[in-house]
């Protein structure tokens, strides 16, 4: 087991820079099966990705299993802007982002009839978007990238035939890159940070057909030390940049029902305290031309709203080797118009997904396809912007997830 844990730890470090999302802050594409069911997969049998969806369900795993997953995320979107305040959108463009990849790796071992241990690395938060560098919306942001990855370790215990619980620790990594042109002058900010979090989960089975579960994930407070470069027509300079941001806590509630030995359904609701993201203030080191001026803080209020995500998924076993899955999910919009910007330009989201799985005694292979319909987002002018108002519209994301699990 130690060999597998060390390998997974090393992989987490190597994969971290690639663990990014698309047009949202929150990522749920942790496995092909989970994505195929809309993220409603808290009670799966013998699935190592339970480490991500519901650690209390590690107790549903027999023996020792390892799983790897990768999600291909291709976002698309258009913008239009009012440049002179006449209520006419007279400039337009599109999200120019390249497709992103969100990997996940999981390892679970049953210690005895009562105890399990699991380890996983996956992306809980992430964002990546790009717009035309010389467009007017570049004054808000023409490139933003938040690479996020979590490395978690959980202990799970089956207390009796009805109760299972789990508790775990998390190391959360965030890498931030932001490029914008406030008042038309290029600014580049880049930094990385690590912080600790924790989680707890519990399942209760009413009988062999009905089960409920709850998962709590703690907030994670990051303090970033980075660097910046700023260019004006008269001079260019750089230095240190510092900022704090708190990634929000969440509660996930799930219900699972087995219609028979071949068909089951899950419902999931997740509440996220997005109001933790109330500001993204950055403090810059003194300018080299006037070091006596002291550090300069640039406030960036966000004031996001708490929100819910609802999902329903169904899984049907076609034979002893093949299963099919389908799901639908709805994410509420947490970004108010007054504080929206092109750093995270996403509205409410509806996701539709399908998947298929092959399984035998030694392995499972799964493929999921999905389409995410992203709602419009209106934006008002903020300090440094050279437009009066703007709007993201006609946004959508295509997603493909592939997973492979090996049973030792």
Ranges and model annotations:
Residues 1-21:
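Gram-negative bacterial Sec-dependent N-terminal signal peptides
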Residues 12, 55-58, 71, 84-91:
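Beta-barrel outer-membrane channel/assembly domains of diderm bacteria
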Residues 20-22, 32-39, 46-47, 53:
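Residue-level signal for pocket-adjacent positions within structured domains
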Residues 23-35, 86-92, 100-408:
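Outer-membrane beta-barrel porins/channels
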Residues 26-41, 59-78:
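Transmembrane beta-strand segments of Gram-negative outer membrane beta-barrel proteins
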Residues 39-46, 75-98:
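Surface-exposed strand-loop-strand hairpins of Gram-negative outer-membrane beta-barrel proteins
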Residues 42-45, 49-64, 107-114, 159:
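Outer-membrane beta-barrel pore proteins
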